Amino acid sequence: MLKILLPTLMLIPLTWLSKNKWLWINTTTYSLLISITSLPMLYHPMDLGYNFNNSFSLDSLSSPLLVLSCWLLPLMIMASQNHLNKESLMRKKLYLTMMVILQSSLIIAFTSSELMMFYILFETTLIPTLIIITRWGNQNERLNAGIYFLFYTLVGSLPLLVALLTMNKNLGTLHILMNSILINQLNYTLSNSTLWYACMTAFMIKMPLYGLHLWLPKAHVEAPIAGSMVLAAILLKLGGYGIMRISLFTEPMTMHLLYPFIILSMWGMIMTSSICMRQTDLKSLIAYSSVSHMALVIIAALIQSTTSFMGATILMVAHGLTSSMLFCLANTNYERIHSRTMILARGLQLILPLMTTWWLTASLANLALPPTINLLGELMIITASFSWSNFSILLLGLNTVITALYSLYMLTTSQRGKFTHHMTSLYPSFTREHMLMTLHIMPLILLSLNPKYILGMTYCKYSLMKTLDCESKH
């Protein structure tokens, strides 16, 4: 773990010692080397040894999210170059420092083997994200968005702290490996139900669950490009990761208490997808799309079947890359027409045809078209939901149709149509932007060729049992 964490921390002195001419080259190259170094950490399901120690652990759930975090850091730096062009050198370095601190917090959060350390790092990610939104956002409303983000996250996390302290008092430890041995099945009592709700509240707000999602569109719309990318791609996944980790320790409470959350998720999935059809702001549409996709992850994580856990892990990785790519494309539009309103960008296909190709690719990935990994994740979740309840296929099928509608609506409104006369002197697309889109779409397609590396905990356990069974027969 330290071979990823220490080089990431060393990005801070590299940033402050680099001259203006070499700042972007040094940080982008070095962070890309770190992301390539992290790729072997994709957990191989047939590897029987878990990487556990007192402080850090790596398993088949945390490794895909860890690699995703490392992969997106150089992409965030590449996407921010034009945005920070007019800033002073000191502010550029401060911006990069905030991103590195956020990245380091995420690495420790995804690999911490103790739940209290995970909680502390879960909260630590709030600080650099808040600074990025409130200092480098575009409009004055960024302060209001920062307040929403701060209070939703803090108020939701307080019950989780109380629940963890209670578990520590009862068990004497919060270590993930020890808890899986020590915890007996909980009785269905009022106190245990309260404990379960306290654990889940913070993660439901972070996902976010429909009804607790008001902070997300505000934060996305007002954040700069790197803030939007890390929010959509990584920070929302902390919620799904937390649900899947904690729910294993609170059995069988999840089985009794999941119904209101699944019903609300299914209803919210339809509502937020429908809201996307009425949006005029491009970043707001992508933000509501994230709420809709994360509702699927909540459903899969709470059902807790083998297929649903696999689907949730895949969809978290796939959505991280897809939504990040969509925000990058929205940023390329904003840098040229200086507006997030979709109708003002119509006709861009005539000027930037290659960018329109990237828009088409990202929209098709968003609606889970093969050969992207999104399709496998959504199919697994729909299959698991149908096995859990036949009625769910109606809502999930309707959501799939609406997702296709708003994805095509986003594409046609922002790229096709009659050319607007206010766009007179637009500069062309850059190689940097095309490289950025390639590094987003390439993992989505390549992972579909061999998805076992991101199938998560349940596939790993299934492979382990199959291997041991074969060995016992021989």
Curated annotation (Swiss-Prot):
Reaction equation(s) it catalyzes: a ubiquinone + NADH + 5 H(+)(in) = a ubiquinol + NAD(+) + 4 H(+)(out)
Pfam family, one: Proton_antipo_M
EC number: 7.1.1.2
Residues spanning the membrane: 22-42, 60-80, 93-113, 114-134, 145-165, 195-215, 224-244, 257-277, 284-303, 308-330, 350-370, 391-411, 435-455
A GO term from the CC aspect: mitochondrial membrane
Subcellular location(s) per record: Mitochondrion membrane
Enzyme class (EC, first level): translocase
GO molecular function, one term: NADH dehydrogenase (ubiquinone) activity
First-listed, main subcellular location of the protein, grouped into a coarse class: mitochondrion
Membership in a protein family: Belongs to the complex I subunit 4 family.
Function: Core subunit of the mitochondrial membrane respiratory chain NADH dehydrogenase (Complex I) that is believed to belong to the minimal assembly required for catalysis. Complex I functions in the transfer of electrons from NADH to the respiratory chain. The immediate electron acceptor for the enzyme is believed to be ubiquinone.
NCBIfam families from the UniProt entry: NDH_I_M
Protein name per the record: NADH-ubiquinone oxidoreductase chain 4
UniProt source species: Didelphis virginiana
Gene name of the encoded protein: MT-ND4
